[in-house]
């Protein structure tokens, strides 16, 4: 445990916040894309589909690298039990709060919008359970994965710490090319696991909890560990904060491959396995692209940026039901996809910010949506 706090990583704080807030244009553009969602516009937009695919191809990989970075930083700062408790509370409490307050009403709304209320009694017990698993976890899935990764990483982080204490500091002798090969092989390994499951027991891949707890965790754990290693080895972090033409070109080629796979791939064939390999390496390359841009443009302290850093989780939590409401009741009345998309951004962001300001003034809600207990104000002793 270290009592000396690490210097503030302003650009990483900012990147994490903007990746969270990107969820708003991501889900609003999903309404206007060619992808089938809960609610869709009458006519899809090719450029909003392209925009949506680009965000989806890299956003969460970069997010989990940053999460791993900060998780290990705090691991060195707190005793083990306190670290686990703090980390799980910070993500677990908002997740458990959002289920009854946000995703349950969202589920009920969708039942009426999609006219499925009459079909609910006809579902089997498992079908009801699985539907609720998908719909109640919904956009909160990454919080569940973070709880799992935090728990799993106890042993891994402890091993990292012991190696730091017993070994002399040395550079992480690994290039971006070697990392690319490693993540390519990890993508193939993940694809192989999925294909084996598809052959042996394909039905389990449609199970919501299995998808969130097992498949999503398996995919994102390399990025989480990479973030921790970037904290341990400053030279590794420097590789990500230094612009790489190879990573930029590689990410562009990977995105083209991603689009081609989306266009010509088949879910009954190898589309999902191919996508996992592509997004694994593209995620790595986009870490370099995003970190280097963020380090150059966002590595400063700003009250406005700090506001959105603090607000990003709450805004992300509430934006999803707001987006679905907009898509169900407002989108049909707007003929232009561009105007609809812009109106959606204003509608969702505006209401989310109002709700954020309201919740800040209610201590219980502030705690439930942040997982942070209220800070006790120490009384000052009067000086005579």
UniProtKB/Swiss-Prot annotation:
Annotated compartments: Cell membrane
Where in this chain does the entry annotate a coiled-coil region?
none
| InterPro entries noted in UniProt | Acyl_transf_3_dom, Glucan_succinyl_AcylTrfase, Glucans_biosynth_C
Q: Which UniProt keywords apply?
A: Acyltransferase, Cell membrane, Membrane, Transferase, Transmembrane, Transmembrane helix
Q: In which pathway does it act?
A: Glycan metabolism; osmoregulated periplasmic glucan (OPG) biosynthesis
Which stretches are transmembrane?
Answer: 17-37, 54-74, 91-111, 140-160, 173-193, 212-232, 240-260, 274-294, 311-331, 338-358
Pfam family for this entry, one: Acyl_transf_3
Which GO MF term does the entry hold, naming one? acyltransferase activity, transferring groups other than amino-acyl groups
Top-level class of the enzyme under EC nomenclature: transferase
Q: State its Enzyme Commission number(s).
A: 2.1.-.-
What is the membrane topology noted in the UniProt record heading this document?
Multi-pass membrane protein
Signal peptide: which range, if any? none
- Biological process (GO) annotations? glucan biosynthetic process
What cellular component GO annotations does this protein have?
A: plasma membrane
HAMAP family assigned: MdoC_OpgC
Protein purpose: Necessary for the succinyl substitution of periplasmic glucans. Could catalyze the transfer of succinyl residues from the cytoplasmic side of the membrane to the nascent glucan backbones on the periplasmic side of the membrane.
Entry's family note: Belongs to the acyltransferase 3 family. OpgC subfamily.
Please identify the protein, giving its name as recorded: Glucans biosynthesis protein C
């Amino acid at each position: 445990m270290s009592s000396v706090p690490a210097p503030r990583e302003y650009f990483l704080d900012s990147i994490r916040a903007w990746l969270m807030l990107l969820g708003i244009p991501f889900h609003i553009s999903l309404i206007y894309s060619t992808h089938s969602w809960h609610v869709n516009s009458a006519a899809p937009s090719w450029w909003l589909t392209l925009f949506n695919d680009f965000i989806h191809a890299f956003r969460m990989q970069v997010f989990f690298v940053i999460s791993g970075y900060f998780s290990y930083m705090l691991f060195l700062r707190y005793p083990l039990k306190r670290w686990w408790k703090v980390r799980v509370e910070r993500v677990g409490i908002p997740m458990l709060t959002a289920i009854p307050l946000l995703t349950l009403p969202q589920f009920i709304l969708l039942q009426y919008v999609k006219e499925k209320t009459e079909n609910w009694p006809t579902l089997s017990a498992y079908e009801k359970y699985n539907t609720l698993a998908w719909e109640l976890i919904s956009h909160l899935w990454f919080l569940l994965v973070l709880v799992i990764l935090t728990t799993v990483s106890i042993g891994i982080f402890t091993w990292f710490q012991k190696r730091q204490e017993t070994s002399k500091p040395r550079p992480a002798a690994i290039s971006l090319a070697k990392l690319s090969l490693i993540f390519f092989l990890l993508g193939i390994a993940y694809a192989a696991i999925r294909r084996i499951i598809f052959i042996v027991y394909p039905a389990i891949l449609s199970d919501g909890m299995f998808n969130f707890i097992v498949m999503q965790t398996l995919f994102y754990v390399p990025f989480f560990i990479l973030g921790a290693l970037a904290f341990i080895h400053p030279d590794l972090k420097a590789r990500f904060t230094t612009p790489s033409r190879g990573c930029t070109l590689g990410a562009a080629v990977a995105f083209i491959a991603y689009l081609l796979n989306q266009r010509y791939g088949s879910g009954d064939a190898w589309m999902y396995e191919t996508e996992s390999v592509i997004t694994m390496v593209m995620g790595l390359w986009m870490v370099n692209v995003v970190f280097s841009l963020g380090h150059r443009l966002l590595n400063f302290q700003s009250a406005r940026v700090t506001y959105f850093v603090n607000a990003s989780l709450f805004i992300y939590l509430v934006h999803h039901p707001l987006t679905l409401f907009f898509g169900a009741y407002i989108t049909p009345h707007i003929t232009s996809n561009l105007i609809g998309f812009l109106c959606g951004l204003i509608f969702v962001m505006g209401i989310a910010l109002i709700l954020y300001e309201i919740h800040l003034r209610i201590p219980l809600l502030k705690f439930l949506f942040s997982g942070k207990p209220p800070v006790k104000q120490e009384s000052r002793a009067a000086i005579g």
